[in-house]
Amino acid sequence: MPSADGSSSARPNGTSSRSDQLAWYKSQYEQLEAELADFQASSRELEAELEKDIEASEKRERLLKEKVDSLKYEVEEWKVRLEFTTFIADDGPRANLSLPRQTKYKQSKAEGNSAQNTLQKEITTLRDANRTLQLKLRDIEVANDDYERQARHTTSSLEDLESKYNVAIERAVLLEEEMRAGEQEREKLRIENQRLRDELSDLKIETEIIHEKLRNAELQNSRRRKPISLRSPSTPQTPDLFNRSPASSIVSSPLFSTPTLKTSLMSATATPPSPPISESSSSLRKSMNAMPGFPLQKASASDSSFGSRSLHGSRTQKHNNHSRATSYAFTSNRPTPSVTNRPGLPKPKPKPNENTNKHNNNARSSGLPKSGSLYQIRGLIGKMQKLEERVQSAKSKLPPPSDSPSRTSSRSGSILGESPVASTITARRNSRKRLSGSSFSSSVRDGDSVPSYAPHSRPSFGARTQGDSRPSSRTSYSSHSSVSHSTHPSVTPSTRPESRQSRTKTPLGHYSTNPTTESRRPRSSLSNPSNQNGVVNGMAHIDEDEDLAMHMSLRARISEIRETRLPSISTPTGLKKRTPSGISGIPAPRTLRTSTGFDRLEGDMGPPERKSNITDLGETY
């Protein structure tokens, strides 16, 4: 193929050099080689395209062959059908020719019909199953709705029951609270009722005792009308009367073994009863008028009545407005329960007024009546026995004793043969516990010990120093009070030591017997030294605190009477004595706990006339 370049396209001639020829041939060779490569590439592409076309044509050919075959089969079938139809329509010798084709057609038709019937049956069965399942599903849904409705009803009923249950619980709690409050109120009412019954019974017994004492006093006043002559100052003292040394004053207690009735009668014979209070007070006035140096007292006949709160009117206490010391004046020479003295607290010296001077002048105007008759002693013993019978009959009417242990009181007054009734006891009730006790106080003058009683729940000792000139109580030692006054005319009066009527408190019942706690004891309820004006007559001037303490003391008397039901208990020996500071030789009260569980205080001191141990008369604890 000629080149576009003229120099190269021109074939070199023989005159041209070999290099030119060689270059021309090389260019020709390269050109032909490039054309060959292009041709080969184009031929390869063409070959690939042709192969693709061949494959596509072959595929089309196969499809067409299949179509041809199917069409041939259809043609054959149509031919058979056509022949069959023609055979049916035309009877002739041609039927024999189409018999094989007819058999094949029937066979295929039978197969088709059987398959169609089977499919129709399956369809019918499936439809029935579907309908049945739909019905079941509907029934299940209905049942599910019923269950849901029932569950809702059950839930609502449970909620209602829970609400009702909560309401019932709240109501039950409220009812329990109301029942508890009702029980507490009923218990309070029962306690109040029992307390009122006890107070009523106490008041009845106290009234009976006071009436009996009043009758005894009237009888003794009617019997003792002849006064005895006063003792002159030069008359020597009776050694038994003024022998009040600590050796002769023996502490007795209800815990010691009670002597027989014979011993009590002997003690009553040895200690004759004192004259009536009115006569002894008149003799005391006379003796005091005869002694100008003796301290004056507030005294009257009504002072010594059984409800008197003041036996020593000259010893007033300006600071004591609520006295609680119980004091009953008896009709014989029995030591009177008086206010106990505390040696540590001095009291202001009272100023005698015109009333005290007047009463003391009246006290000096009469003498002591005669006392010592065996007839009077026997009469007193008979009255004492009657009173004991009345106390026993009153005990049978009392309710049973409480469960809490109570403290008994010492009854040292009944050994002297005058009144069988023991000292009144001031009891403090703490809740349901009824606590009672007795206190002992001893007044010492010139080394002598004089027993006196104060109805407290703890014992204490009041000391009398050398200058203390308090005379003996008109109700306790009325037989020799004027003698002691006339024998000691030069005794200077001094202030009375601090007694239990000071503002001190006491532990209730059996909580403490420590002497350090005895100074906190409150006063008794009835005995009040007249610290405000004039003479206290009977129980007319008892204030509210004293009324309350009086009721407590009356209830304590019931406790004391109940304690008499217990068997007698002997006291163990070898007990230590407790002596307060500043006092020597005075028997101190001792606290003993017996096997019955009752805490008792012994501080009873025997009368100065006797040297032997003195215990209660006919009373066992």
Swiss-Prot record:
GO terms for molecular function: microtubule binding. InterPro entries: NUDE, NUDE_dom. Residues 1-20, 231-263, 323-341 have a biased composition (Polar residues). Pfam families: NUDE_C. It is found in: Cytoplasm, Cytoskeleton. The keyword Transcription regulation does not apply. Keywords: Coiled coil, Cytoplasm, Cytoskeleton, Microtubule, Transport. Residues 264-288, 300-310, 353-362, 404-414, 469-496 have a biased composition (Low complexity). Residues 18-219 form a coiled coil. It comes from the Eukaryota. Residues 599-613 have a biased composition (Basic and acidic residues). One of its GO terms (cellular component) is cytoplasm. GO terms for biological process: centrosome localization; chromosome segregation; establishment of chromosome localization; establishment of mitotic spindle orientation; microtubule nucleation; vesicle transport along microtubule. Its main location: cytoplasm. Residues 1-21, 218-372, 389-537, 569-621 are annotated as: Disordered. Belongs to the nudE family. Self-associates. Interacts with nudF. Required for nuclear migration within hyphae during vegetative growth. PANTHER family: NUCLEAR DISTRIBUTION PROTEIN NUDE HOMOLOG, NUCLEAR DISTRIBUTION PROTEIN NUDE HOMOLOG 1. This is Nuclear distribution protein nudE homolog 1. It comes from Aspergillus fumigatus (strain ATCC MYA-4609 / CBS 101355 / FGSC A1100 / Af293) (Neosartorya fumigata). The gene is nde1.
